[in-house]
Amino acid sequence: MKLDTLEIGKDAVVASVASDDQALRQHILDMGLTPGTEVTMMKYAPMGDPLEIRLRGYELTLRKDDAARIELVGVHDTDTGPRTNAAIGTTEHPALGEGTYSPRAAKTAVPEGAPLHFALAGNQNCGKTTLFNQLTGSNQHVGNFPGVTVDRKDGTIRNHPEASVTDLPGIYSLSPYTGEEIVSRQFILDENPDAIIDIIDATNIERNLYLTLQLMELDRPMVIALNMMDEVTANGGAVDVNLLESLLGVPVVPISAARNEGIGELVDHALHVARFRERPGRLDFCAPDGSDGGALHRCIHGIANLIEDHAVTAHIPVRFAATKLVEGDELVTEALHLDRNELDAIEHIITQMEGEAGTDRLSALADMRFGFIGDVCGRCVVKPHESREHVRSVKIDRILTGRYTAIPTFLVIMGLVFWLTFGVIGAALQGLMEDGIAAIIASADAGLKAFGTNDVVRSLAVDGVLTGVGSVLTFLPIIVVLFLFLSILEDSGYMARVAFVMDKVLRRFGLSGRSFVPMLVGFGCTVPAIMSTRTLPSEHDRKMTVMLTPFMSCSAKLPVYGLLCGAFFPQATVPAMVSLYLIGIVVGCIAALVLNRTAFKGDPVPFIMELPNYRLPSVKTTVMLAWDKAKDFITKAFTIIFAATVVIWFLQTFDIRFNVVADQSQSLLAGLGSIIAPVLAPLGFGDWRASTALVTGLIAKESVISTLTVLLGATSPAALSTMFSPFTAYVFLVFTLLYPPCVAAIGAVKSELGARYAVAVFAFQVTVAWIVAFVVHSAGILLGLA
């Protein structure tokens, strides 16, 4: 029987995992789907694909195509009876220096006060970034969607200025399946941190220890932070921390990052192992008399002896290099510079092991690790009863991922978000902001007049800087409110469910459900959305998502929509704005179909993702995220937009001889805009002022408003009507929606994929924007709307 045919509510045992893609097969094994593992079918997505299973204490989603490669045996009904937990002692965890166990330590310690650097590593959704915030006081983005940490983040440990820590991306193993796994592994190998802080979710130790064993093989000083211990005890579980510490050979400190409990003790242990270079006391996890007769043990030790000199030269730990060669890791193989005879000898050793063990190399390694983990957990862990968080998540999912309720609920939630943002909360706060800024501008103008300030200087200050920057700042409340809602959806765990629900739809466009989240984040800001594509395991998926994300209307375009829709469609402002969002989505879908059949033609990408429990978003985290976005927006207003406003005012005020012009059509700006205007004339807005506003919008979309404000002297409906009709204003908005978001977004594309793709994205978006705007304009003429 195959996994894709297992009935909901049934249990079965994995017999084998088959796949032509060895990297995908290894990833499936790393996620815990090894032969002998019991799985429970939880549900199918509303459209029948993908499916959700439960194994090793957590939920995993994968597509039916991939599930069909997993053979099952022993199908039976799920055991729902109560579980009786054995008691575990409550021996107090010894303070630093009180314990009897000590890992391998260097003979001389690093001097007090010498710089120390730590790597913070762990699975996704284990509280890693929350711990990073507690350690450093830094306000990073704490989310509950797999892969929220997409770049390197550094901070200094509080009260220890000599100690810094880097928050690495959340990963499940050190196999090079995703870019994040490669980044984390190379950081530890190349930058050689003084110690690793490995954070483990105590509610699912079995799953988290898989990465821990691989980190230990790197033979670096290390301390384990056993997080969420408060949830374990609250749900009837227990962990013998002292025994766990002894079995692993690494210091283990119980903490609760969310409650800031145990952080001080963790820091003390981390500083200690770093200063004394205390490496793990254990690197070998396969017993010489194991169930395979010691075949894997002999294999790894044989390879280690063969490659020891190469590993030392390449600065790669020998044990780690040996296991990676068994896996067939190409990056490690290349780094070791092995000759053909050595490679043949290694392959012979591995083939002999497979014959003796009766299984393939990847399954043998995964079985070895999970077997060791099972023995450890069996001795020192009492699994908690089903947690309240999981019970709550199952109940909520009946609605949010239900067959008939998932998509309607999603539409209601997103509709509510946009309605509250544009029509209720954001609009009310925007009105207050407009009144305040208008009062400031009027007071400044009156003050400068009373002071007798030169008219040109007063025009620069009032008409240029204050009016231009102020017109953009009035949209700050809308942007902050939108980010607040997006943050709540992400931190609660709902974003992951959206990816699960939407996967089948996106697959028709050549994407996976995981692409949905970066594109949804793109409604807030394109830059972090593009950066978050780094979490996607497939290069095909990643590049496609980067190409399409800019079509999702970012919050920086909101001021432009709000201004023109409010001026020309006062009775239908919200519907007009929503229609723009829908156009962006439709164009993105069409572009995806075209790209998937041309530039990015290929096989569908896998969809394998953990579904975290729902959690109440942290008020502090949500508010601080909103503050960070507000701060970024204000900084942009007073830097980029300020500079753009001054430049636009200067070009609009003077002619080529630097004389003040009486007619703006004679200005430097008019000359520059006139060069581009003919290209835009077929779209209905060949006015040089419109083309100038679009050019400055490439710096920052908010600059479109400040430019129009400076050029028109006001942004009232009367002033705007001198340049647009309602119809041409809408076509202008369509072009604004689809052409490149800003220089920062193009820079993010360059950073992620290189200059060639950045140029391609820019050219692609300009072309699509022109074509769609031309179609809308032509259709309007045929319908008599022009």
Question: What do these predicted regions represent?
Answer:
Residues E356, D360-A364, K383, V424-V465, ...:
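Extended, low-charge hydrophobic alpha-helical regions
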Residues T409-L420, L482-S487, C565-A567, Y581-L595, ...:
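Hydrophobic core segments of alpha-helical transmembrane domains in multi-pass membrane transport
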Residues F551, S555-V578, A744-G754, V775-A786:
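Transmembrane helix-loop junctions at the membrane interface of multipass transporters and ion channels
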Residues E92-S173, E191:
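Conserved G1/Walker A P-loop phosphate-binding module
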Residues H160, R185-V252, V560-Y561, C565:
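Conserved C-terminal guanine-recognition region of P-loop GTPase G domains, centered on the G4
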Residues L400-F500:
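Core alpha-helical transmembrane segments of integral membrane proteins
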Residues D435, A439-S443, A496-G524, K601-L625, ...:
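Juxtamembrane inter-helical linkers in multi-pass membrane proteins
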Residues V223, T233-H385:
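Alpha-helical transmembrane helix bundles of large polytopic membrane transport and channel proteins
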